[in-house]
Amino acid sequence: MSQQPANIMKYKINLFGITRDIVGDNVTEIEMSQSADVQTVLSELKTNYPKLKEIKSLLVAVNSEYAESNLVLSENDEIALIPPVSGG
């Protein structure tokens, strides 16, 4: 059984609405070389999926609570991208 190096952090992000449509799946994972905050993970996602940059009011929830951009994440955190709600 192989293990990843200790300094690699793997984050699982749950996707909803338009973010799910852009990525093409309900969940995506990214790996970072060190622990990261919400803003860093969001920036990496926007690099990997440039259409996410078009969403102006994208919110991030960590462990079922809206998160500030400077919140440092743990690998076991439940991360969700929440797009703006539309409709009537």
Regions found by a protein language model. Name each.
Residues 2-86:
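Ubiquitin-like/PB1-type beta-grasp interaction modules and other compact soluble beta-rich domains
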